[in-house]
Curated annotation (Swiss-Prot):
Biological classification of the source: Bacteria, Pseudomonadati, Pseudomonadota, Gammaproteobacteria, Enterobacterales
UniProt-recorded name of the protein: Phosphoribosylamine--glycine ligase
Cofactor: Mg(2+); Mn(2+)
Gene Ontology MF terms: ATP binding; metal ion binding; phosphoribosylamine-glycine ligase activity
Listed NCBIfam families: purD
Length: 434
């Protein structure tokens, strides 16, 4: 099969790398890709933006692409699946209206409430004065979210009224997030542990993948600003079989039922951010209509079965008959980023390190890299994701840190505590059988 992967991040590097292992894949194109996909002889970068839908359609026709897999959320929210389907070009990813589950947090909240899916209480606002008036009656801390896509940076935990007034001014008046911030959600703050539940779904079934835990704050011990994700690991041992069953029963099944009732046409990845409270209750934080990044790197690095076969089964066959085979070891990814990320950061910095000598069971996934005059350079805030397998979480963490410390550029930083929550829970419940 001729495959086109749309996107240029670490998630898309992991997807194309995994697809290349399938017996069903022949040629794999990545649009636009990055330096990591460029140096992989099984992959070919195409200089087309992931948001240039017309050029992607033209390319898919010319190269007789058998399947297009969409990585990032923006082209999905812009209707890439609708356009490809119109031209009878097979594509893996939900239609534009269905992708509103991610592109509009208000749409998602209304959906959750309508189908009695547990989530935090909330109010929506487009007027600054009404929002601040409401905040004078609430108990802090609370959470404020911009309605539209903000690439992981449109959520803020607010500790007091002064802080909330500033954030609302930035969003609703100063338009810091553009049209994405034309409305906001003010939510009760949920407490507990946040996990990422990922599944391949269609309108007739689902295939759960590995559960993972992301680390969204830029600094150790969850300090600093919200980012797109600074690291992830899988599996997550504190998700017991009882909690897992509650996720399926209380969240996934009613979500799929609601999708059918609302005619949300969907064949793709569904990633649900879930908060598990200290009584083991589950609540939906958010829907994402694609893999998380860096969750994709940790999940796909564990996967032993044929990812492309699972996708094809979702599109053409019986998805419920599929079984995902996973390595029983831990997979842990550490994101290497450029100083000042997620604020303004420089690009074009030379990256130094021996990429040829990856440790056994370690993979360097490229997120924002570019080859300039045969020099590997940074091309964004999150640059690389060092992902390792280990018999223990400590083993996987150690391997990733060794490689992370061997790669350098001006201002490189990473979190040192990715996976520490798992270590904490395993020690706390060392006599408990998960």
């Amino acid at each position: 099969m001729n495959i086109l992967v749309v996107g240029n991040g670490g998630r898309e590097h992991a997807i194309s790398w995994k697809i290349a292992q399938s017996i069903f894949s022949k040629k794999i194109y990545v649009a636009p890709g990055n330096a990591g996909t460029e140096i992989d002889y099984k992959l070919k970068n195409i200089d087309i933006s992931s948001n240039d839908i017309n050029k992607l359609v033209k390319f898919a026709k010319e190269k007789k692409i058998d399947l297009t897999i969409v990585g990032p959320e923006e082209p999905l929210s812009n209707g890439i699946s609708d356009v490809f389907s119109y031209y009878k070009l097979p594509i893996f990813g939900p239609k534009k209206f269905s992708a509103k589950l991610e592109s509009s947090k208000i749409f998602a909240k209304n959906f959750l409430n309508k189908y009695n899916i547990p989530t935090a209480r909330h109010k929506e606002f487009s007027d600054q004065k009404l929002a601040i008036k409401y905040l004078n009656r609430v108990k802090f801390p609370i959470v404020i979210k911009v309605d539209g896509l903000a690439f992981g940076k449109g959520v803020k935990i607010i500790k007091n009224i002064k802080e909330s007034e500033k954030f609302i001014l930035d969003v609703l008046v100063k338009k810091k997030f553009g049209m994405s911030g034309s409305k906001i959600l003010i939510e009760d703050m949920l407490h507990g542990e946040e996990i990422s539940f990922t599944a391949i779904i269609n309108n007739n079934g689902f295939l759960p993948m590995a559960i993972s835990q992301d680390h969204k704050k830029s600094g150790d011990k969850d300090t600093g600003l919200n980012t797109g994700g600074m690291g992830a690991y899988s599996p997550v041992s504190f998700v017991t079989s009882s909690i897992y069953n509650n996720i399926i029963k209380d969240i996934l099944l009613p979500t799929l039922y609601g999708m059918k009732k609302e005619n949300l046409i969907y064949t793709g990845i569904l990633y649900i951010g879930i908060m598990i409270d200290y009584n083991n209750n589950v609540n939906v934080i958010e829907f994402n209509c694609r893999f998380g990044d860096p969750e994709a790197q940790s999940i796909l690095f564990r996967m032993k079965s044929d990812f492309l076969l699972h996708i094809l089964s979702a599109m053409y066959g019986n998805l419920d008959s599929q079984i995902i085979e996973l390595d029983n070891r831990y997979s842990l990814g550490i994101v290497l980023a450029t100083k000042s990320y997620p604020k303004k950061y420089p690009i074009g910095l030379n990256i130094l390190g021996n990429f040829e000598n990856e440790l056994k069971d370690t993979k360097i996934f490229h997120s924002s890299t570019k080859n300039i005059n045969k020099n590997l350079t940074t091309n964004g805030g999150r640059v690389l994701c060092i992902t390792s397998l280990g018999k223990s979480i400590e083993d996987a963490q150690k391997k990733s840190k060794i490689v992370a410390n061997s790669i350098n550029w001006q201002g490189k930083f990473f979190r040192n505590d990715i996976g520490n929550r798992e270590i904490f829970y395993l020690k706390k419940y060392k006599n408990y059988k998960f």
